[in-house]
Amino acid sequence: FRGNLGHPEPARCRGRESGSSVLFTNRSIRPRRLEPERERAFWGVAVALFAANVRFGRIIVGISHNLVAREIRPMATEKSSSRSWMSDAAIYQIYPRSFKDSTGSGLGDIAGITQQMDYLERLGIEAIWLSPFYPSPLVDGGYDVADYCDVDPRLGSLDDFDDMIAAAHARGIKVIVDIVPNHSSNQHPWFKAALAAGSGSPERARYIFRDGRGEHGELPPTNWNANFGGPAWTRVADGQWYLHMFTPEQPDFDWSCPEVHALFCDVLAFWSDRGVDGFRIDVAQGLAKDLDRDDLDDYVVWCTNDQPEDGSHPVIDRDEVHDIYHEWRKVFNEYDPPAFAVAEAWVRPSRQHLYASPDDLGQIFNFEFAKKDWIRDDMHLAIEEGLESAERSGSTATWVMSNHDVVRHATRYALPQVPTGEYHRLPLDWLLRDGTTYREDRALGTKRARAAIMMEMALPGSAYVYQGEELGLFEVADIPWDELEDPSAWRTSRSASTKGRDGCRVPLPWVAADAPQLDDPNDEFGHGGSFGFSPADAKAEPHLPQPKWYKDFAVDVESADPDSMLNLYRRVLA
């Protein structure tokens, strides 16, 4: 942040009514995703099933018939002709540290993304979304941000970022970046200043500090546990406690502080001025908090979607959070076209429309596909709820099968499809035990994944594609525990509830011949190669190990096979 930290109110948000709250289209929409007519939805899915040769096609054929019966209407109202370019787009999520390493450091970087821009253009996507690339201690994969207006020097520079933006825009590809407004890194200058300033200071007002309970304040203010395990409060040297919904290294901002509002309005403007087209808002449901009540111990602060439907939870999905996004909308509308935003908000389907309305963020991820098994009724419900939520908000539907937080869908579809009543319980149990508890039927998982992308592209709205799913990658379940990076694993234990999310974050395979060398043919992981992720003369190994079976999924192998998953994606996205 390079602004006036002491400004009494948001620097970019003071009564500025420039522009319109209605987004408009500045790019023609490709024929494959025109108005969502009933016939198009049905026949698109039918062709998908035929092409994928899925013997369980009756699951989605049934969904298709129900969509026809429901009589899907175009989401158009009077806003139709001015909908955002994102209303009908395919967006490719890049996890930068695992996409392409241009320097040999073992970490993917910004220049690596630029190097592969032709690959992205050929894939046929309209936009790329970059997970955090900011300076960070990397406690949580970059979601612990130490500086919101710079590039982590291990990943490049602002000049590299500008080059990447220019390369993307030259190919007609938009760029979306991650914004992390719920918390910062504990290495952020603001938090260091808060620790130094002491209780009651303006510096501490930027974060959520509270006195403890008990005779000497030795007990935390509430009994909450954090999302990644352990308590949600950490005590500092002078005896106060600070809140962190995730790790102790990620202290939560206090959004009742005007300086926090000013910071993020200026951050949004900083990146928009550099040419960024939009923003993905991390933990969008968590910013507004009410800790001045007596029933706090009755709640949990985990980011699930089973909170109260009336916005009464003390820290998650409160109605006041939308005041923040209405403020941001004024910043977005200063640009022509207005900056785009999408909420990562794990909230009930009945609350999604609040985030997706045109005067709010404008779009919200629908994670129902990412949560459902390959079961007809579950998939049908996911589609119904997604369409209804979009219709209610005046926005467009979104479809997400995989991302950096969930087990890859090719693996989920390859495991037994047994409803457990809990989110991903079976895949997470399978992962926790290094992929040994259930048989992964990869042939079936691949067939289902092929059908799934065709179904997704037949539906109205935006599709989000996670890097590697276009290769048909499966989850890497057996990463050695001592090489895991995800705090949701290392803050628990091998007998706890999760092994973490690293299995979907393994660096991509680009060249099959550059395979790691195995000390023993039975070894799963080797050394000395990176499947083209890093340069041939790289001095460092990839930051996560790549399994030997990656050679069959390398980009060069799949590019040469007309029937590969990659070429299927290229056809359906073209």
Residue ranges and their predicted role:
Residues 66, 72-574:
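Active-site and adjacent substrate-binding regions of carbohydrate-active enzymes
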Residues 10, 18, 36-40:
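Cationic, low-complexity basic patches in intrinsically disordered or flexible, solvent-exposed regions
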Residues 4-7, 26, 65-66:
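Intrinsic-disorder-associated, low-complexity terminal segments enriched in Asp/Asn/His/Tyr and depleted
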